[in-house]
């Protein structure tokens, strides 16, 4: 059994251009009749497994809110009664969507998530953990009645036809689960709260288009490097403000300007790339960036490598250990050990911040 709750603040958060959504998932050890293995024997911070499930839910529900809805919103989900034959990760999205659907939050769902595995030639929806061990294809997909929102998983060299069939099989179940949520909403759903109408300025938007579009096109077609391109695009924004009538600067809305400019820049660059079949750095759409690889880049670690693709670099190390170095995975359903650990770090300087 899964408990899902959804709460949103009554007032929108001012001065932001993103949706402040928080999704948390936790598997209570009591759900499986277990005591946590930590020193204090209390529930601790979210495990990597729980964080990954949070991301699955977040990616599925985040697009389903109005663009101008910026109220703080929390979706908290707990496993409160476990079943060793059921993987909860494929049900968490359904629970979150159901909670949002019957709440007063302006959620434009419902959505649902299911796991689909190909086992001995058959496509099975939400297989048991034991069944999934023999899967040659194993995916989680999220969707609405009309569309697929997200697909994530793994396979052993699955064909494109198998992947499409798995998605079709899962979507049939998603449609049924969405219809069930709609019925639930009609029976006990709360009236949806009103969403604040965003302030718009059609005259300012047109001025931004007239001044910026041609300049953005020139930058997009110049086959420049990332840093030079970023500098020139930033200069376009500065030039617009510098050329804005001085008598109107007192009422100039910088937030609206940034909103309009970002939308226009995105749409203009997308149109240029699609029409010309050339990427921003001059590559064709089917041409990859230059690759460079170097092994043993560091003298002391057991192994290391430097991988470079264009302006993107990854420095990796590998450490070998004995069985005593295995990672203990203390989940609600069972205690297990992991002999391969992949740790990923993305510090702020990676993007120049």
Regions found by a protein language model. Name each.
Residues 18, 109-111, 134-136, 286, ...:
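Short beta-strand-initiation
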Residues 1-9, 13, 196-336:
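Extended amphipathic alpha-helical scaffolds
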Residues 1-86, 145, 152, 302-353:
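Glycine-rich, flexible beta-strand/loop modules in the N-terminal catalytic cores of phosphate-handling
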Residues 10-12, 61-66, 101-104, 113, ...:
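A generic local secondary-structure boundary/capping motif
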Residues 79, 83-88, 97, 110-117, ...:
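Conserved mixed alpha/beta core segments that line enzyme active sites in large multi-domain catalysts
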Residues 104-224:
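Mobile "lid/hinge" segments at catalytic clefts and subdomain interfaces of large enzymes
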Residues 18, 23, 44-66, 70-76, ...:
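Alpha/propeptide regions of enzymes that mature by internal proteolysis
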């Amino acid at each position: 059994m899964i408990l899902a709750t959804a709460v949103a603040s009554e007032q929108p958060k001012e001065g932001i251009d993103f949706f402040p959504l928080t999704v948390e998932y936790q598997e209570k050890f009591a759900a499986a009749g277990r005591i946590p293995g930590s020193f204090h024997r209390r529930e601790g911070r979210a495990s990597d497994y729980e964080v990954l499930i949070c991301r699955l839910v977040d990616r599925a529900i985040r697009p389903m809110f109005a663009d101008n809805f910026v109220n703080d919103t929390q979706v908290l989900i707990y496993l409160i009664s476990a079943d060793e034959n059921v993987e909860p990760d494929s049900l968490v999205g359904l629970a979150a969507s159901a909670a949002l659907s019957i709440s007063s939050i302006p959620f434009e769902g419902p959505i649902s998530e299911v796991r689909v595995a190909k086992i001995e030639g058959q496509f099975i929806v939400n297989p048991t953990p034991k069944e999934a061990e023999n899967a040659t294809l194993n995916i989680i997909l999220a969707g609405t009645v009309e569309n697929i929102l997200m697909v994530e998983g793994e396979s052993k060299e699955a064909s494109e036809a198998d992947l499409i069939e798995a998605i079709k099989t899962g979507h049939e179940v998603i449609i049924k689960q969405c219809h069930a949520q709609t019925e639930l909403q009609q029976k006990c759903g709360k009236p949806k709260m009103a969403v604040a109408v965003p302030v718009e300025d059609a005259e300012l938007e047109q001025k931004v288009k007239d001044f910026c579009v041609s300049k953005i096109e020139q930058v997009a077609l110049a086959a420049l490097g990332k840093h030079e391109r970023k500098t020139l695009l930033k200069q376009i924004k500065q030039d617009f403000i510098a050329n804005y009538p001085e008598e109107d600067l007192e009422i100039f809305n910088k937030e609206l300007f940034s909103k309009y400019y970002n939308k226009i820049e995105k749409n203009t660059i997308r149109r240029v790339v699609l029409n010309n079949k050339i990427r921003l750095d001059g590559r064709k759409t089917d041409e990859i960036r230059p690759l460079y690889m170097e092994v043993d880049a560091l003298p002391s670690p057991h192994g290391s490598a430097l991988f470079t693709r264009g302006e993107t670099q990854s420095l990796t190390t590998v450490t070998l250990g004995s069985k005593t170095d295995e990672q203990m995975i203390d989940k609600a359903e069972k205690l297990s050990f992991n002999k391969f650990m992949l740790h990923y770090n993305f510090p702020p300087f990676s993007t120049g911040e």
